[in-house]
Amino acid sequence: MTYSIVARDPGTGQLGVAAQSCYFALGSVLPWARAGVGAVATQSMVDPGYGPRCLDLLAGGVGAAEALERVRAADEGREVRQVGLVDASGAAASFTGSLCIDEVGHAEGDGFSAQANMMAGPGVCEAMAAAFAATPGSLATRLLAALVAAESKGGDARGQMSAALIVVEGERHEHPWEGVLTDVRVDHHPQPLAELGRLLQVAEAYHLCDVAEGALIAGDAAAALAGAEAGLALLPGEGNLLLSYIGALIGVGRMDEAKAEVQKLVGVRPPWEGVLRALIQRGLVPLPEGVTLDQLFTPPAG
């Protein structure tokens, strides 16, 4: 039915969860994560309540194993559940009910737990564990690699449909919705893992865009330009990223290039002109002294 992995990155403290299933929109019920607290995967005959209940216990100082045991003990349907969680220290815990459907199992390791049920064949959890341990890069990259490894062993006996991946910061925040670094999901797709990988790249591009906009607001136009360029390298032609790039070009005084990019943006979708005018009029994209709005929208000479 489903395979998943929860993990903590020892270098950054980041926490994450990723999963795939031949089930519609598993991202709406299976993955749970809270910055500086933990990550939970609840699956099989899923009870979404395991997510917030376990996270609340972890936030209160209860360790992973005890948190899972407390929630499991209160669940009369525990034998059809499968759950994995990891806490902010990297301690992992998992449970597979006796009524979960074969091939079924879980594998815990240093800072992670992989779990699977209704698989096409054996070795799925072990493949996830090995791929997670061997893959370099960010936590999101390693989580996705674990999912790909699971699919290489046959994956869900019914096939593929949906996937999700969440990564949160290692430091706790005041509110549980804060500190989310990555939250992407595929609800219905013939190749959900490939689509999840594409969305991770889109998410990274937009993260760079957010960094660029923050730098521009802080008055660091050079950093804004570097961030916008990096984002566009990942996602060429994306309108929102082009808007950040234009703002950064204006900030560093490269007006002819900014005008050229404005023409490209407005040429593809004319209503962007109104958006950019509104941002400038409200001071969110400041123009250099002596440059007017109309001049910005005038094509550069030559």
Give a label for each model feature:
Residues 1-221, 229, 239:
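N-terminal nucleophile
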Residues 213-214, 247-248, 280-282:
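Residue-level recognition of tetratricopeptide repeat
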Residues 231, 264-265:
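Canonical positions in the second alpha-helix
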Residues 236, 270-271:
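Short coil turns that delineate tetratricopeptide repeat
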